[in-house]
Structure formats: C-alpha cells, structure tokens
C-alpha cells in the first residue's frame, strides 16, 4: 500500500494504489478497513456494507460515488442521519455544496419542483446528490419523479437500511420498484437483522431480487419453522418456540454473497462502565409499589389506571423519573411532579466532574430532558439537546455548550 499526494488546481487529493486493484482518488486519508470496504464495493453494482456505528460507512460511500463516477445519486436515510451527509460530502470530496440537495428539508411539492428542473446528464457534468428521508421519498408528488429518465438516477444508497425491513411498508415497496430500474444499489447498516432473520428479505428485494426472490410467502416457508399443530388450532402461522427458524446457514451464505462485513480498525480509548444505583425516596417507592400491586393509583389531583403490561412498564419509568400523568374527572390530564430526587443526584454527580469535561446524557421523557436542562443552568454551563423538539447538537460539538441531552428515539441512529 502506498499513497501519493497530487494537486488538482488548488485542491489536494490522494491517489491510493492497492496492489493490482484500481487507483482510488481520495480527498481524506481512509482507515484500513475503509480501504478494504471500498475495494470490495468498487466492482459491484449491488452490495451491502455492514459495519458498526462510527466506523465511517458514510466516507466509504462518498469515496465510492467519486471513484465510480456516478452522476445522479439518491441517498435515503432516516431524517436525523440525513443531516450528516452534506457535511461529510464536503469533508471527504470536492463535490460542490450546491450539487448536494437536502430534499428532506423541503415539502413534497418543492421536492418535485426541484427534481423536475434537472435535464439529462451532459458530458463532463459533475455529480448531483439528493438526500431524502424514508418517510417522504415514496410520497406524492415526488414519488413518480424518481423514475423520470431525464433525471437519470444511477445510484441509490439506503442508509440505515433496516428501516425498510418490513415487506409490506409503502416505503419498502416503493424502493423495491425503484431498485428494478436503478443500475447501482447499496445498503448501509450496522444491524441488518435488527429483530430476526426475516428482516433481510425486504432489504434484498431492493438490493438484488435474484438472491431471495420476490415471493415473501415462499421465503418464509424456506426459513421459518412453523408449529403445524398450534397453527392449525389458532388459524394462523405460529413459529416453533424452541427452533423458530431453519436453513439459517443458507440464508447467511446468500446474505453475505454481496455484503462486506469487517470490524473497525479504529482503536478508541477504553471506556469505563459504572453502574450507579440511585435509591428512590420513600414517597416515590410507596407510589411505585402501589402501582405495581394494584395497577391503579388515586390521588387528590386525579387518578391513574394501567390497562396492559406495556403501559405498566412506561408508568413505572415515569414514576422513577419523578412524574405521574394523572387524569381528572373532567377528562383532562395533569403531569404531577412527585419528586426531584434524580435531578438532585445528577447535579451532585456532575459537580464532581471537571468543568471542562463535555457530558452526554441520554433520557426517555421530555420531563427528564427538562430536568437535565435545569441542572445545566444551575451549574452555569451551556446546554444543548437532540430530541423531537430541538436539535442544537452543533452548539455542543463546537464547544459552545458543555452538556448534551439526548432523547433515545432522536439520537439512536447516525449522530456524527
């Protein structure tokens, strides 16, 4: 392996030669596993990239776009990961910022209007990249525009592709149709089998339908182990409890026939894991035990009832957070605060840390994030948040704030 730095006008690039493989033009130096992944993906028109979060999948795909010479690229991702792509493209390539279109930030009408302005690719034309989220890529009026010949989409990248694992979802079906006409297709995810082996079907229906076919029932018959007797009694398929799946070696062999998987070569600092138990005060513990025992609570401000096991889990979590959603007789709901013990503990814990130490705190409920914000204000340090209501991550990354509160659902994927 050797690298040679060359100049292209005022810009500096690297030409990387991998033995007998093609020379890759790279703007930024790749890690070893990124080079191997690029070498694997480069000759393939349909392939999957399975590496862990933080391993640089986005850079690999940007380098692939540049070196394959794609002209019209559609990147589909969840909305939060969509925000990562444009800064990464500017960092790892010389593609002009004006050629990167963040469609996820536009209405459906404006998406369609923008795409309709594109004419067929001309000789010498640069690359245009369209970044769109899964929730809107298939919706009208933009859905038909992706198929226009004059738009000429020649590559589709599904980032966090486990989002299309449901064979019946409208987004998954739409991308399967689009995959039939687009010559180059790629999957990116760290969890291709997020819940069970059946998750692979819809992803590969988009990627390469020749691998598992397009008949989901036949796919299930081949890889699911159904309890025939129990299924006959209830009238619908029930999987065998002891061995719900079969032929998994065959499934994995086909799955990795066009997929690259490799552990990251990046050596991160060792982490220290500590479990700190925060005892509940007696008044909170009493409420928790009564709720667990009776499945209901009655207070002066209102009452609370639990109808199922999932609801019970959520209500218990709310109690430990120090809040209770109580319903009044008139049907209105009040979120009653029963304790601030966790806020007090968090303040004492953060007080022990160096003032320059950046902190990330994950939480589930909006009231938890509110408590974290109040602790930050009490400490006199800045606060940023990644949630369904707010995204001020840039302030934390730039050092303007010290504490970052992250809601689990909003910060679960591709936060750079």
Where on the chain are the PLM-derived regions?
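Conserved helix-turn-beta segment of the N-terminal RecA-like "Helicase ATP-binding" lobe
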Residues: 82-108, 210
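Conserved helix/coil segment N-terminal to the catalytic DExD/H
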Residues: 110-125, 129, 135-152
